[in-house]
């Protein structure tokens, strides 16, 4: 029978489709610039990164397409798919920029997880699988 794998306690969301569609090479751990309502929603497990990707522009990395459902009792209009800045150091950004300039290379988010009460995003350099 099909048994669901248990997520570890610190894993919030996982992008299994990235492992299926891409061959992942180098992995990086990036912080996320979030608003308060987003952190509260993530604590309730309302985050999805299956359609997300990483956009590199102006020497910055952005997480695009990550869907975080707003809380039901929120009193203002919140955008669940807004662009969120990834926090990386200069050496990591330079390595990612250099690698993605090569033909066929891209950068995809693989999972969201907690680390010392902070939300982190694991991103990986990837090459599309042939076939």
Enumerate the language-model features and the residues they cover:
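Intrinsically disordered, Lys/Arg-rich N-terminal extensions and targeting peptides
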Residues: 1-35
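Arg/Lys-rich, often Gly-containing low-complexity segments of ribosomal proteins
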Residues: 8, 13-18, 47, 73-89, ...
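Flexible glycine-/small-residue-rich
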Residues: 36, 56-58, 65, 123-127
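Short acidic, Gly/Pro-enriched loop/turn segments at secondary-structure junctions
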Residues: 45-51
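A structural signal for short hydrophobic beta-strand segments in well-ordered beta-sheet cores
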Residues: 52-56, 112
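Helix-adjacent hinge/juxtasegments
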Residues: 55-96
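Beta-rich strand-turn-strand
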Residues: 87-130
């Amino acid at each position: 029978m099909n048994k669901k794998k248990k997520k570890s306690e610190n894993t919030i969301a996982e992008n299994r489709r990235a492992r299926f569609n891409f061959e992942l090479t180098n992995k990086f751990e990036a912080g996320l610039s979030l608003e308060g309502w987003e952190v509260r929603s993530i604590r309730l497990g309302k985050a999805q990164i299956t359609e997300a990707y990483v956009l590199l522009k102006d020497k910055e990395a952005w997480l695009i397409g990550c869907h975080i459902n707003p809380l039901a009792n929120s009193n203002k209009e919140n955008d669940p798919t807004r662009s969120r800045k990834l926090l990386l150091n200069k050496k990591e950004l330079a390595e990612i920029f250099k690698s993605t300039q090569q033909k066929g290379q891209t950068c995809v988010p693989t999972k969201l997880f907690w680390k010392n009460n902070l939300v982190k995003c694991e991103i990986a350099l990837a090459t599309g699988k042939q076939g």
